[in-house]
Each structure stands twice: as C-alpha cells, then as structure tokens.
Regions:
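Conserved helix-loop-beta segment at the catalytic/binding core of cyclic-nucleotide signaling proteins
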Residues: 14-21, 40-73, 82-87
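Conserved catalytic/ATP-binding subdomain
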Residues: 6, 71, 102-105
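Residue-level recognition of strand-loop junctions within catalytic nucleotide-signaling folds
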Residues: 34, 64-68, 97-98
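Catalytic/regulatory signature loops of cyclic-dinucleotide turnover enzymes
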Residues: 20, 85-91, 109-130
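A structural signal for short, well-ordered beta-strand segments
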Residues: 61, 92-94
Length: 130
C-alpha cells in the first residue's frame, strides 16, 4: 500500500503499539534515490510486499514492515537492489523497533540519520546502526 506522508507518523505509531502489545518487531527502511521523484515513486511500490506500507516523500520512500526485524529488512533491501539491478542509485537507512526507538519520531529519526550516512557511502550502501 502506498500512503501519503502526513499519514506516516500515525501508521508508524500504530504499528509500534501493536508490536509492543504482541512483543513483535517493526522495521523501517528509508530508501534514498537519485531518480526524479515521480518516476521512482511510480515504480517503487511495485517492489514491496503487500503487507508493507510505503510512504513516498521528498526524503525518499519510507517502507514500514510489520512483524519484521532488522535481518528481515535486509532481505527486503536485497530484493529492492535486485529489482532495480543498478539502474537506480539507491541507498538505505534502516531502523527497527524496539532496538532503535520506541516512538514514531524516534524510529523515523533513526532511519533518516542512517540514510544520511548511507548517502556519503557507495551506491547501494545500507546503514543499520548509528
């Protein structure tokens, strides 16, 4: 599902509350790209799982993965890389509940910090820790 950016905080907060209650994980991948937004945002949602939520913003695409830990997020990132096969310069910031934040703001901030670091790395860089 593709959502609008204003819904991002609400949906992340909802997923965190659910994960906390059932003692599960939630991961967020922030995907940065150098492709024009309209083109990327029209293609990228086709790559994500039906159960994931995608929010396209000026910062990139936030992919929220319920019941997915950090290693599961890395598997998804490999799928994204294979789909684009080097045709798009992708970089990734990953954050997971409960390890990287307990609120929507904390999780989103962690993903943004990590994407910022990934942007200074090579094409396809993935940053999972601060």
């Amino acid at each position: 599902m593709v959502g609008k950016a204003p819904d991002l905080d609400f949906v992340v907060d909802y997923e965190i509350r659910s994960a906390r209650r059932y003692q599960r994980f939630v991961s967020m991948v922030l995907v940065g790209h150098e492709t024009p937004n309209e083109k990327f945002h029209s293609i990228f949602p086709d790559v994500i799982r039906d159960s994931d939520e995608c929010f396209c913003t000026d910062h990139g695409a936030f992919v929220l993965m319920g019941e997915t830990d950090g290693s599961g997020a890395l598997i998804a990132i490999d799928r994204y890389k294979q789909f684009f096969e080097g045709s798009v310069d992708l970089r990734f910031g990953v954050a997971s509940f409960p390890f990287d934040g307990n609120t929507a703001d904390e999780l989103i901030s962690a993903a943004q910090r990590r994407l910022s670091r990934a942007k200074s790395g090579d094409v396809g860089s993935v940053v999972t820790t601060d």
